[in-house]
């Protein structure tokens, strides 16, 4: 269910702010979004997997916190990230 190393490296390269960046809010949010999307596909086939649903809720909350942090720190980066990821806000 987790992302493979190649999927992670592609996402990191796409969203990194500078070379070697793996911890910026943009990268973290992009990785969480990919994991969330993968889990949503899992729940289409496994509706009663409540243990994984708890992990999904934790990921969504963590993404929300990171987005709130980014919005307070740099609004333009926040808006660009939301548009690039296709999130609703």
Swiss-Prot record:
Molecular functions per Gene Ontology: rRNA binding; structural constituent of ribosome
**Alphabetical GO biological process terms:** translation
Q: Which domain of life is it from?
A: Bacteria
The record's listing under SUPFAM superfamilies reads:
S15/NS1 RNA-binding domain
Please tell me one Gene Ontology term that the record gives under cellular component. Answer: cytosolic small ribosomal subunit
Q: Which Pfam families match?
A: Ribosomal_S15
Which keywords has UniProt assigned to this entry?
Answer: Ribonucleoprotein, Ribosomal protein, RNA-binding, rRNA-binding
| CDD domains named in the record | Ribosomal_S15p_S13e
Looking up NCBIfam families in the UniProt record yields: S15_bact
What family does the entry list? Belongs to the universal ribosomal protein uS15 family.
Q: What does this protein do?
A: One of the primary rRNA binding proteins, it binds directly to 16S rRNA where it helps nucleate assembly of the platform of the 30S subunit by binding and bridging several RNA helices of the 16S rRNA.
Q: How does it assemble?
A: Part of the 30S ribosomal subunit. Forms a bridge to the 50S subunit in the 70S ribosome, contacting the 23S rRNA.
PANTHER family reported for this sequence:
RIBOSOMAL PROTEIN S15, BACTERIAL AND ORGANELLAR (PTHR23321), SMALL RIBOSOMAL SUBUNIT PROTEIN US15M (PTHR23321:SF26)
Q: This protein is called what?
A: Small ribosomal subunit protein uS15
Organism field = Hahella chejuensis (strain KCTC 2396)
Q: What is the lineage of its organism?
A: Bacteria, Pseudomonadati, Pseudomonadota, Gammaproteobacteria, Oceanospirillales
């Amino acid at each position: 269910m987790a992302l493979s190393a190649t999927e992670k490296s592609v996402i990191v390269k796409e969203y990194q702010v500078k070379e070697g960046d793996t911890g910026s809010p943009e990268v973290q949010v992009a990785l969480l979004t990919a994991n969330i999307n993968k889990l949503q596909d899992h729940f289409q086939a496994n509706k009663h997997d409540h243990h994984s649903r708890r992990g999904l809720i934790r990921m969504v909350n963590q993404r929300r916190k990171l987005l709130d942090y980014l919005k307070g720190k740099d609004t333009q980066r926040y808006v660009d990230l939301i548009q690039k990821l296709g999130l609703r806000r």
